[in-house]
Amino acid sequence: MRFFALFIYRPVATILIAAAITLCGILGFRLLPVAPLPQVDFPVIMVSASLPGASPETMASSVATPLERSLGRIAGVNEMTSSSSLGSTRIILEFNFDRDINGAARDVQAAINAAQSLLPGGMPSRPTYRKANPSDAPIMILTLTSESWSQGKLYDFASTQLAQTIAQIDGVGDVDVGGSSLPAVRVGLNPQALFNQGVSLDEVREAIDSANVRRPQGAIEDSVHRWQIQTNDELKTAAEYQPLIIHYNNGAAVRLGDVASVTDSVQDVRNAGMTNAKPAILLMIRKLPEANIIQTVDGIRAKLPELRAMIPAAIDLQIAQDRSPTIRASLQEVEETLAISVALVILVVFLFLRSGRATLIPAVAVPVSLIGTFAAMYLCGFSLNNLSLMALTIATGFVVDDAIVVLENIARHLEAGMKPLQAALQGTREVGFTVISMSLSLVAVFLPLLLMGGLPGRLLREFAVTLSVAIGISLVVSLTLTPMMCGWMLKSSKPRTQPRKRGVGRLLVALQQGYGTSLKWVLNHTRLVGVVFLGTVALNIWLYIAIPKTFFPEQDTGVLMGGIQADQSISFQAMRGKLQDFMKIIRDDPAVNNVTGFTGGSRVNSGMMFITLKPRGERKETAQQIIDRLRVKQAKEPGARLFLMAVQDIRVGGRQANASYQYTLLSDSLAALREWEPKIRKALSALPQLADVNSDQQDNGAEMNLIYDRDTMSRLGIDVQAANSLLNNAFGQRQISTIYQPMNQYKVVMEVDPRYSQDISALEKMFVINRDGKAIPLSYFAQWRPANAPLSVNHQGLSAASTIAFNLPTGTSLSQATEAINRTMTQLGVPSTVRGSFSGTAQVFQQTMNSQLILIVAAIATVYIVLGILYESYVHPLTILSTLPSAGVGALLALELFNAPFSLIALIGIMLLIGIVKKNAIMMVDFALEAQRSGGLTPEQAIFQACLLRFRPIMMTTLAALFGALPLVLSGGDGSELRQPLGITIVGGLVMSQLLTLYTTPVVYLFFDRLRLRFSRKNSKPVVEI
């Protein structure tokens, strides 16, 4: 009592404490970073290696495997996957959450160094690594276009200057430049001219390499001067290479220009990039795993004026895609929802109290509690994101509850004629324990969330802590500021009922009287209520099993990603045409604002597209509806498919897939994997629960298999190395020399001129110079026949892997899709040599599904323990927790009604309901126990009186929580996909709980009281009088 009096009788100190909390919160708010969601990115490092011209199988066995064995020894690696394609290997390392990305990078570099001696010779550079997840959508895409500059020159400027500058910005993890390649001098050989002159391809290569050298020449000095020796030992342009003498034929010089076309071109001509309908160079910027997306984008935008100043006038630099506007719009929507919730909650209080002064008290308590929370969020390193702001929106109904309970009890004493300060002290003392019980038991709900591991635990931690801090501050405010304001602002009055006979007061009296009448009937028919209670428990179990489930609500971020997959034997020219066709289809859609794309590189039959949709206010359809519409349009394109998916703020795993969810097949036998993957993919494609089924296993590429006759080769004086060198020189875009420039290094690339390699007959024109100097045609010692070969080889760990990706059709949940896949795998009878498991987001969903019930049970158990300690009773916590089944039924029925699957957001709503609905029972039980102890009432009389006395605060707190969550249900615009499931769950649970617990709680109270008396009689011993 003295504790409460300290704040009631010292108003200045109390006001200053509240002001200090508010000021700290305002300062914290201004310093908090902004993000779409809490930081949940796994630390990911990508290792890249290249060996131009090497087949995917060669890259997998000679490059990927040695690196994997070395990298696999690093501590904290959660998953390691690799993909090897023509001349390229990429290994993705995903680390545990607690692994520091910089420390992991040092270990990766050490592992690369350890594997260096096992890697094949001829690699143009050592393997490199980047601290970025290649499967993440870029946070920003910049495009460079020009009417006068070539694509190679644009690419050179972008990679040499722009990418380097952008990479230095805080938060940037990787700047991937696409659309072309670095400039190079390309030597296109004429096989017939070489044969006529008797010049081998190796001779050409060696001549070029010998003519372009960069070696130190030293210096000459005398007693006075010193001269640095410099020679013209370097050739830098095509014009300088053309007159190069490569051979003498009967004393006549054979120059390079006589047997080849030499041009200033690019290293890899099989690359193309576009923005809308124009050729472009793309700078795809990804953030570091731990970086804040908004701060990183702001840093890039701040750098743009400097970048534009250094760009020549002939180049146009534009932002093709920016993730930040939709994130900011989403947060603005949440902030508006928060403001509406606060207004609605205060309106509810005013309607019940019908007094401006009385309403002002909780109207002050709410902002003080919410604003003060920002300070704690800043100290915890949190951000302003959708989940933390949603926590504050929901907290609006919670933080006002404590103030309402205290205010309502003080007002009751004032209405009885007690003096204000005395009423404030007496009223606070009476409900102080109740308020503490309500708040501590509510915070206890979130303790299991704080201990939850993995991605869900990281994702929900900020929500739980933010809400717990708001409740804690609210508890302090309700026991200090609220009674002080009541004591000094409210006035006592003589007992009268007139105010209750007007407007809302009259309705409340009528409701209370009707409730009293119905409660009497219920207390006389307790068995029927017991049956209803047990029915709600059973209905909970059935609804939870039956309701569709998913991991996280599908968001409309305004950005789509598209993966193009064409026939495996397609040429680059045809693939470029497919890219243009698909971009036109997308560009013509009225909901699309911008589209960029690229193709080429090591995977000729694939391409990527990034689509920016118009803002939500300018289009009627959701992102998924637009995808459904575009899926129909692009299905008419022959020889290729475009797989579209909406970019999400959460994406798990490092696999680059053409759909949102993945199912991975593993086997130690590559043959078994290649046999069963098509069967499984075909069966999954037929499932109505899946859409856009595709696979990264591409083992049907066109190959020309050359078979050497080794005996003939030996007789002709030719070895296998010379024959393989011939093929590499002719068709491998072989980088044979380096040109050193001040800003970068460029390559001299040699191959047969594309004019002479249009079909397989080009092999007939190839020849090898044997040991006797004679030109021996390739057809003399080799035969060739067409065959199929893989375009890529994939590993997970050290096992061969194939990932089947899929999207969800409209109206299908992830749980329905995973159940259908598991059922199909069982029906197919897949052998044990092929193992299947979900990966990425689908894998996390499976893990979350297994822990959801455990989490709910743990929350209930924690609340029981806290209540048991507070009440020093095993029984009363059970009475309070009996409110939960009705809330669960209401929440699940509401989700079914709105066709919303049970997601991680809905789980948060269930956890919140555990904390909300028990408040009604706490208020009933507290007053009933007090009435039994001090008033000498029977349990039936005590619980009946408690229900009637607490009817008004129960209605106030429930309606405050309901109206606080209602804006989440009704909200639209950006980010509404996250807010609505939470609001639906809470509103549905509150409505059902309010209808049932006003009757079931008294019945359960009496049941346990009778049970207690029965056990106490059994355990009591007769007293013997002496």
Swiss-Prot record:
Which keywords does this Swiss-Prot/TrEMBL entry list? Cell inner membrane, Cell membrane, Membrane, Transmembrane, Transmembrane helix, Transport
Task: Answer yes or no on keyword Cell inner membrane.
Answer: yes
Q: Which residues form a coiled coil?
A: none
User: Which residues are listed as membrane-spanning?
Assistant: 15-35, 333-353, 360-380, 387-407, 431-451, 463-483, 528-548, 853-873, 897-917, 953-973, 984-1004
Q: Does the keyword Transcription apply?
A: no
| Pfam families assigned | ACR_tran (PF00873)
How is this protein annotated for GO cellular component?
A: plasma membrane
Q: Which family does it belong to?
A: Belongs to the resistance-nodulation-cell division (RND) (TC 2.A.6) family. MdtC subfamily.
Subunit structure comment from the entry: Part of a tripartite efflux system composed of MdtA, MdtB and MdtC. MdtC forms a heteromultimer with MdtB.
Q: What is this protein called?
A: Multidrug resistance protein MdtC
Q: Which organism is it from?
A: Salmonella dublin (strain CT_02021853)
